[in-house]
């Protein structure tokens, strides 16, 4: 297994990983929907901020995707949200609320990330290695900090991020948590 930069040949594997690791019913039903919201933007617009966990045949079985600037991401994401028009009204509201809630932390933590790994790559230290690869990359680009959202009931993920130096920034109970990590003073 190897951590490496995203290559265009990884695109469909990354989209498959995004869909296979989705848990919300609407996302499980629609690969296009979950990928529009959580994968395609990063691969299309910020591929240099994307890293994959590749198996011995060089196939992506995990990834970490990042947008280094929340404001640029918010503007560029509009066409993706428009394409995702099938998303239910309540899910759109929740997405907007999460975005608004994060505005208070974007100055200190301007980047955000998504990380997903298929079961065969989990619990082997690769999640930490993906975080380290992205954090080093963002640090070298002068990015001050990075944050992420995680489900409120995902206690394993809470422990994982805390063990990797992420601090709880916002707790929305069952709706989720926002964690962040400073990369530069």
Model-found features: residue ranges?
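Conserved beta-strand in the GNAT
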Residues: 52, 59-68
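Conserved GNAT acetyl-CoA-binding A-motif
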Residues: 108-111, 138-151
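C-terminal "cap" of GNAT-fold acetyltransferases
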Residues: 144-158, 163-185
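Conserved acetyl-CoA-binding loop-helix of GNAT-fold acetyltransferases
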Residues: 114, 123-140, 159-163
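Active-site rim helix/loop that mediates acceptor-substrate recognition in acyltransferases
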Residues: 29-50, 56
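Helix-loop element at the rim of GNAT/NAT acetyltransferase active sites that forms part
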Residues: 5, 16-32, 41-42
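A short beta-loop-alpha structural element at the N-terminal edge
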Residues: 2-16, 68
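Conserved acyl-donor/pantetheine-binding loop and adjacent beta-alpha core of acyl/acetyltransferases
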Residues: 70-114
């Amino acid at each position: 297994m190897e951590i490496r930069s995203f290559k265009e040949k990884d695109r469909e594997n990354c989209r498959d990983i995004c869909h296979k690791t989705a848990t919300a019913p609407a996302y499980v039903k629609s690969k296009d929907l979950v990928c529009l919201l959580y994968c395609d933007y990063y691969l299309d617009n910020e591929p240099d901020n994307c890293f994959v966990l590749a198996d011995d045949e060089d196939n992506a079985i995990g990834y970490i995707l990042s947008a280094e600037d929340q404001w640029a991401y918010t503007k560029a994401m509009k066409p993706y949200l428009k394409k995702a028009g099938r998303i239910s009204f309540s899910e759109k509201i929740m997405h907007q609320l999460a975005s608004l809630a994060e505005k208070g932390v974007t100055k200190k933590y301007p980047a955000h990330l998504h990380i997903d790994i298929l079961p065969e790559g989990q619990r082997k230290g690769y999640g930490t290695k993906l975080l380290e690869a992205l954090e080093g990359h963002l640090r070298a680009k002068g990015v001050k900090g990075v944050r992420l959202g995680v489900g409120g009931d995902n206690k394993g993920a809470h422990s994982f991020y805390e063990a990797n130096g992420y601090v709880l920034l916002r707790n929305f109970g069952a709706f989720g948590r926002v964690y962040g990590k400073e990369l530069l003073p």
